[in-house]
């Protein structure tokens, strides 16, 4: 007897796996070199959403020091973005890379938005990288990684800062923040390796390990003539006077000096970071930093 399947419900098709989030995968590259008794941008690869200005000469007493503004043409970091910035300072080059405004990190998903920075600094080169804060919007999921390779005699100032902000004023937290720092010698040996992670609810909770502070910044100083003397140049007092809570300590393996700042908000943090940056910049470069145009 034949068996009929007419009238039986069809077997449901297997559910399709959700597509992984797709963000932008972009790498920008800048190379500063010594040429004609000054510092020139000898190579640049700057795809969207990165954008740079021309190199400015903002230090009459040090005309060889180039200042360059890095900008975002897309309005910030979005879900699952993976943006990488590589900067090299060749021997004798002196460069200051900064921004004109903070970078917004928008709501993310399971896969974080990633920002990687890779710095290579040759002997007798000076590189200062001090962007404005990353601003974490509600639901932002961000992973930041900074890797520095420095030759003996290299000088560098590298800052990083984050603040949180809810545009509608409801105090909604970001999702999660991962921070990583690695400093290597030219042979690839890791001198410093730091990792930290905090979720937004813990960051903003009444019992937060940050206390009442809602903004956090770090500064790495490499190649100072005397770290102990630099630490004594009232760095803590300068940042504290701006409203920050500041710590200064030597980095492992004699790599340099590290600073950490806490502040109630991004504006206060920026003021404290700028106060410290001015002191360190003048110590390492021999001139006061030019006033940044905003």
Curated annotation (Swiss-Prot):
Domain of life of the organism encoding this protein: Bacteria
Any one Gene Ontology MF annotation carried by this entry is: nickel cation binding
Q: Which InterPro entries match?
A: UreD (IPR002669)
Functionally, this protein is described as follows: Required for maturation of urease via the functional incorporation of the urease nickel metallocenter.
> Which family does the entry's similarity section mention?
Belongs to the UreD family.
Q: Which PANTHER family does its entry note?
A: UREASE ACCESSORY PROTEIN D (PTHR33643:SF1)
Q: What is this protein called?
A: Urease accessory protein UreD 1
């Amino acid at each position: 007897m034949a068996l009929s399947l007419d009238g039986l419900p069809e077997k449901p098709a297997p559910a399709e796996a959700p597509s992984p989030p797709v963000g932008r995968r972009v790498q920008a590259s800048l190379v500063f070199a010594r040429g004609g008794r000054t510092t020139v941008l000898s190579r640049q690869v700057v795809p969207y959403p990165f954008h740079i200005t021309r190199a400015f000469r903002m230090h009459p007493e040090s005309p060889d020091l180039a200042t360059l503004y890095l900008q975002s043409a897309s309005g910030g970091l979005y879900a699952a973005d993976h943006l990488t910035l590589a900067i090299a300072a060749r021997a004798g080059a002196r460069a200051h890379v900064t921004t004109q405004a903070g970078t917004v990190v928008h709501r993310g998903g399971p896969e974080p938005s990633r920002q990687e920075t890779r710095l290579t600094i040759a002997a007798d080169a000076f590189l200062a990288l001090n962007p404005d804060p990353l601003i974490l919007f509600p639901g932002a999921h961000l992973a930041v990684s900074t890797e520095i390779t420095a030759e003996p005699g290299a000088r560098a100032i590298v800052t990083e800062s984050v603040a949180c902000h809810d545009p509608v004023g409801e105090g909604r937290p970001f999702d999660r923040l991962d921070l990583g720092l690695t400093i290597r010698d030219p042979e690839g040996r890791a001198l410093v390796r730091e990792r930290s992670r905090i979720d937004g609810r813990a960051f903003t909770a009444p019992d937060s390990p940050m206390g009442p502070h809602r903004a956090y910044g770090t500064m790495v100083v490499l190649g100072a003539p005397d770290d102990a003397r630099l630490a004594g140049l009232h760095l803590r007092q300068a940042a504290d006077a701006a409203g920050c809570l500041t710590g200064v300590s030597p980095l492992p393996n004699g790599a340099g000096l590290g600073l950490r700042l806490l502040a109630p908000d991004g504006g206060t943090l920026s003021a404290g970071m700028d106060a410290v940056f001015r002191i360190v910049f003048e110590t390492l470069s021999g001139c006061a930093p030019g006033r940044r145009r905003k």
